[in-house]
């Protein structure tokens, strides 16, 4: 086998009704999901620091990081099942290393989830425009409802932290960490 044969992707024999634009959009979504995982991992590490010490914030964001990575892996599996090719891109560094407060991190997470949701809605529209019912069903089944739930949960967390006086009232984040995140399913 020549070097050229090893480096060029052969055409898929399973590909059917899978537009190149959809394939490219899936690769972009994979990158976005991995970026979200990376951001949540950064948040988790911040809250696990000895000078921050909010262990349930750390656990919550670590769980979110794992979920986002699983989303990326699911999309990779879909890409292979549909006969597409996975082209991984560099994952952008999170915008910050210091998340300042639980409230700030939750607000950033809410913004991130809304961005991911918007990207999924655009992917769904593309699949609709390309008459790809398989991709539409996949996005509806595995992503859209979960995104709405995540956005609602994060919105509730932001509201409750604000009501408690965070971040000015330091005790608010400690109590939220202990009583809300300490008893959540995440």
Swiss-Prot record:
Its main location: cytoplasm. Disulfide bonds: none annotated. PROSITE patterns: FERRITIN_1, FERRITIN_2, FERRITIN_LIKE. GO terms for biological process: immune response; intracellular iron ion homeostasis; iron ion transport; negative regulation of cell population proliferation; negative regulation of ferroptosis. Fe cation 1 binds at residues 33, 68, 71. It is found in: Cytoplasm; Lysosome; Cytoplasmic vesicle, Autophagosome. The modification Phosphoserine is found at residue 184. GO terms for cellular component: autophagosome; cytoplasmic vesicle; lysosome. Its EC number is 1.16.3.1. This is Ferritin heavy chain. Coiled coil: none annotated. Gene3D superfamilies: 1.20.1260.10. Pfam families: Ferritin. It comes from Cricetulus griseus. The gene is FTH1. Belongs to the ferritin family. It catalyses: 4 Fe(2+) + O2 + 4 H(+) = 4 Fe(3+) + 2 H2O. Stores iron in a soluble, non-toxic, readily available form. Important for iron homeostasis. Has ferroxidase activity. Iron is taken up in the ferrous form and deposited as ferric hydroxides after oxidation. Also plays a role in delivery of iron to cells. Mediates iron uptake in capsule cells of the developing kidney. Delivery to lysosomes is mediated by the cargo receptor NCOA4 for autophagic degradation and release of iron. Keywords: Cytoplasm, Cytoplasmic vesicle, Iron, Iron storage, Lysosome, Metal-binding, Oxidoreductase, Phosphoprotein. One of its GO terms (molecular function) is ferrous iron binding. Fe cation 2 binds at residues 68, 113, 147. Oligomer of 24 subunits. There are two types of subunits: L (light) chain and H (heavy) chain. The major chain can be light or heavy, depending on the species and tissue type. The functional molecule forms a roughly spherical shell with a diameter of 12 nm and contains a central cavity into which the insoluble mineral iron core is deposited. Interacts with NCOA4; NCOA4 promotes targeting of the iron-binding ferritin complex to autolysosomes following starvation or iron depletion. Residues 16-165 form the Ferritin-like diiron domain.
